[in-house]
UniProtKB/Swiss-Prot annotation:
Function as written in the Swiss-Prot or TrEMBL entry: Catalyzes the addition of GlcNAc or GlcUA monosaccharides to the nascent hyaluronan polymer. Therefore, it is essential to hyaluronan synthesis a major component of most extracellular matrices that has a structural role in tissues architectures and regulates cell adhesion, migration and differentiation. This is one of three isoenzymes responsible for cellular hyaluronan synthesis.
Pathway in which the depicted protein is active: Glycan biosynthesis; hyaluronan biosynthesis
The name this protein goes by in its record: Hyaluronan synthase 3
Locations listed in the record: Cell membrane; Golgi apparatus membrane; Golgi apparatus, trans-Golgi network membrane; Early endosome
Membrane topology (Extracellular): 37-44, 399-408, 462-473, 537-553
EC number(s) on file: 2.4.1.212
Glycosylation site list: 462
Major place of residence: membrane
Length: 553
């Protein structure tokens, strides 16, 4: 069968499959078909709930199978290692906290991989950025193998006083420093994270076989490079691989702790499941590796990405992953490669981060859909389910708060926490860590903050910037609070409206309402007491910050 015909059939097939999945979920939601229910529908179990429950079950199953595959791969390490290609570690730095940057560079120095090339590119060449070059000299600059260059320009914008000849000379100097040095640091004109990554990739060219990416707030496990490299060298159809990203400062605040349990679920359940089918949709910036031969193919297209006529300057890592998928190569995840990274400790900075990630998610969802036909049907199915789920959830919440009864609202809240407890219990089993039970707390954060942030992200999808602000910068942007405030007002208004319009409670409904309220209250009291007893007492105690041996560097 001709290749063009095969491709056309796959495009049609995956498109019909995506429509069937979306149509099935929509039909189940609209019809509200119920398998079982009590009299007057105080309790019920319907088709829509069954579909969501089945999705979570299947996702958890394939995540478990992928972890079992990883463990078996680890047991096979006694066999002779295959030929190892050359690797360059590229670190993107911007207004980084000095302590985090030192930890990052020291961890890079300790990586157990011979002849690893380390390239750090600093986004900024002003006097206030010079401390990062000083830290580079302090940690890695004490040998003849180290080199650096302070560049007035970058590859796409000339600095003040630069001529065409001096700009070209600067480009050549950057390439020479990067290729001739084992450890190199380039300070360049500010241009954003994508500009920084481009400089590292462009300067390396085809001088290495694989490129590992890393953020400057990341502490790397000594074995992280070899573990990701093993995945790439075992299967030539794998174009990129990501590792297990955990939180470096998880006990700094309640928001960083909840982020830590959410990270674990995102990587070890959601991405592990995607990895089983070879379609991980985002190789995270703190820990990822790509085949350089592929990266150099799409480097210019990746850098010059546009959306709705505007140049894209966020979602760099997700688009990098999408470019690999667009070529038909598989993307994988390995929990055997680990790192620790900083996460926001303040609610506002966390909200800004999540809004930006949501922007890149929805934008890249559209790009990713162009390549559904090149990969397993799971990628199509999961993209449809996760892409449309927030909208179904918002519609459900608004309907319940404005057209339901008080009991319906309480039952919904109880159901949300029940699903959260089930997922948290599974995570406790899979990870072997009782702390994962607090994953159920994250559901409240999702309902109250992430849902409105996603809608706001779509509305402002073309607004750009560097990313989450540098660790030395105090966040003063309160714009993210606007959608959250509106959402809370909508919910409170709906609750008041429902309470005002509702008839007197029947005896049965009153009994359900009192029982449900007591159960919901007891749940939160118990979980908060556990949090205060187990987690809160650790906050601020630096010796307990790190759960991995490689963190103390």
């Amino acid at each position: 069968m001709p290749v063009q015909l095969t491709t056309a059939l796959r495009v049609v097939g995956t498109s019909l499959f995506a429509l069937a999945v979306l149509g099935g979920i929509l039909a189940a939601y609209v019809t509200g078909y119920q398998f079982i229910h009590t009299e007057k529908h105080y309790l019920s179990f319907g088709l829509y709930g069954a579909i969501l429950g089945l999705h979570l079950l299947i996702q958890s199953l394939f995540a478990f199978l992928e972890h079992r595959r990883m463990r078996r791969a680890g047991q096979a390490l006694k066999l002779p290692s295959p030929r190892r290609g050359s690797v360059a570690l590229c670190i993107a730095a911007y207004q980084e906290d000095p302590d985090y940057l030192r930890k990052c560079l020291r961890s890079a120095q300790r990586i157990s991989f011979p002849d690893l090339k380390v390239v750090m590119v600093v986004d900024g060449n002003r006097q206030e950025d010079a401390y990062m070059l000083d830290i580079f000299h302090e940690v890695l600059g004490g040998t003849e193998q180290a080199g650096f260059f302070v560049w007035r320009s970058n590859f796409h914008e000339a600095g003040e006083g630069e001529t065409e000849a001096s700009l070209q000379e600067g480009m050549d100097r950057v390439r020479d420093v990067v290729r001739a040095s084992t450890f190199s640091c380039i300070m360049q004109k500010w241009g954003g994270k994508r500009e920084v990554m481009y400089t590292a990739f462009k300067a390396l060219g085809d001088s290495v076989d694989y490129i590992q990416v890393c953020d400057s707030d990341t502490v790397l496990d000594p074995a992280c490079t070899i573990e990701m490299l093993r995945v790439l060298e075992e299967d030539p159809q794998v174009g990129g691989v990501g590792g297990d990203v955990q939180i470096l400062n998880k006990y700094d605040s309640w928001i960083s702790f909840l982020s830590s349990v959410r990270y674990w679920m995102a990587f070890n359940v959601e991405r592990a499941c995607q990895s089983y089918f070879g379609c991980v949709q985002c190789i995270s910036g703190p820990l990822g590796m790509y085949r350089n031969s592929l990266l150099q193919q799409f480097l210019e297209d990746w850098y010059h990405q546009k959306f709705l006529g505007s140049k894209c300057s966020f979602g760099d890592d997700r688009h990098l992953t999408n470019r690999v998928l667009s070529l038909g190569y598989r993307t994988k995840y390995t929990a055997r490669s680990k790192c620790l990274t900083e996460t926001p400790t303040k609610y506002l900075r966390w909200l800004n981060q999540q809004t930006r990630w949501s922007k890149s998610y929805f934008r890249e969802w559209l790009y990713n859909s162009l390549w559904f036909h090149k990969h397993h049907l799971w990628m199509t199915y999961e993209s449809v389910v996760t892409g449309f789920f927030p909208f179904f959830l918002i519609a459900t919440v608004i309907q319940l708060f404005y057209r339901g009864r008080i009991w319906n609202i309480l039952l919904f809240l109880l159901t949300v926490q029940l699903v959260g407890i089930i997922k948290a219990t599974y995570a406790c089993f899979l990870r072997g860590n009782a702390e994962m039970i607090f994953m159920s707390l994250y559901s409240l954060l999702y309902m109250s903050s992430l849902l409105p942030a996603k809608i706001f992200a779509i509305a402002t999808i073309n607004k750009s910037g560097w990313g989450t602000s540098g660790r030395k910068t105090i966040v003063v942007n309160f714009i993210g609070l606007i959608p959250v405030s509106i959402w809370v007002a909508v919910l409170l208004g709906g609750l008041a409206y429902t309470a005002y319009c509702q008839d007197l409670f029947s005896e049965t409904e009153l009994a359900f309402l009192v029982s449900g309220a007591i159960l919901y209250g007891c749940y939160w009291v118990a979980l908060l007491m556990l949090y205060l007893a187990i987690i809160a007492r650790r906050c601020g105690k630096k010796p307990e910050q790190y759960s991995l041996a490689f963190a103390e560097v």
